[in-house]
Regions:
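Short loop/turn segments that connect beta-strands within beta-propeller blades
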Residues: 63-67, 103-107, 152-155, 194-198, ...
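Surface loop/turn motifs at the tips and blade-to-blade linkers of beta-strand repeat domains
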Residues: 30-34, 71-75, 113-120, 161-166, ...
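Beta-rich catalytic cores
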Residues: 37, 78, 124, 169, ...
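Conserved blade-ending motifs and adjacent loop-strand segments that build the rim/top face
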Residues: 202-215
Length: 242
């Protein structure tokens, strides 16, 4: 397995991060959801709703206002990340190190893949996305250390990036507008990264308690999901607020 640790990228990103004070941004809308302990959120293929996973291990499809549309029969184990593209929905389980691939039409599990990681059981994969720049899936480890693993189309690890002390933790990852975006629960921040080398290109401070999920809607608004508050927050795209 080819593995590249981009320490120079991490150092440069850290210098960029500390050189600029993060801009504070505020949500413009919010919607409550009945999904218990929600952990991550992704826009569905029709762009008329979201996929949400939670600590209870269930995959939900919700409307844009957070009301539950349907849910999968499958009961997973500590689902922390969700990504959707085309006919499939990809769910990352933290404790088991498994990625479940669901058929979006039937909500049945079409494939299960184990992606090994030797870290602590409760410090595993917190998010999953697809890096369109590098044409690879990416999963992110919460902390100790904060790592991004790039995966090929068969979910084999082909690259590992150590993000150093970018934040206290990372709770979600997504790809939007040719950038990788990371969310930190403990730091209450969102970061924009160069998708080619994962250097930090922007950071923003959020007034959200326990932010766990991150995506963008069809209009380009940034969507943040709060676990404790069971609330979906909508922000004007941070790139338009610079």
């Amino acid at each position: 397995m080819k593995k590249i640790i981009l320490y120079s990228a991490v150092l440069l990103g850290a210098l960029q991060l500390h050189a600029q004070k993060p801009q504070k941004i505020k949500p413009v809308k919010k919607f409550d959801t009945k999904v218990a302990e929600p952990s991550d959120i992704a826009l569905n293929a029709a762009k008329d709703g979201f996929w949400i996973v939670g600590d209870g291990g269930v995959l939900y499809e919700v409307n844009l206002d957070g009301t539950i549309r349907r849910q999968a029969d499958y009961q997973g184990l500590d689902c922390e990340g969700v990504y959707a593209e085309g006919k499939y929905v990809y769910v990352a389980e933290e404790l088991s190190r498994k990625i479940k691939v669901f058929d979006a039409a039937t909500l049945k599990v079409a494939r299960t893949v184990t992606v090994p990681y030797n870290g602590a059981r409760n410090k595993g994969y917190e998010g999953i996305a697809f890096n369109k720049t590098n044409d690879r899936f990416v999963v992110v480890v919460e902390k100790s250390p904060i790592n991004i693993f790039e995966l090929d189309k068969d979910f084999k690890i082909v690259n590992e990036i150590n993000l150093g002390n970018i934040a206290k933790d990372v709770s979600a990852i997504t790809y939007y507008n040719n950038s990788i975006w990371l969310l930190s629960d403990e730091s209450m921040m969102v970061f924009r990264l160069n998708p080619a080398d994962y250097t930090v290109t922007g950071s923003w401070k959020l007034p959200i308690l326990n932010p766990e999920g991150l995506t963008f809607d069809a209009e380009g608004n940034m969507i943040v999901l709060s676990d404790d508050m069971q609330t979906i927050y909508s922000f004007t795209n941070p790139e338009k607020q610079q």
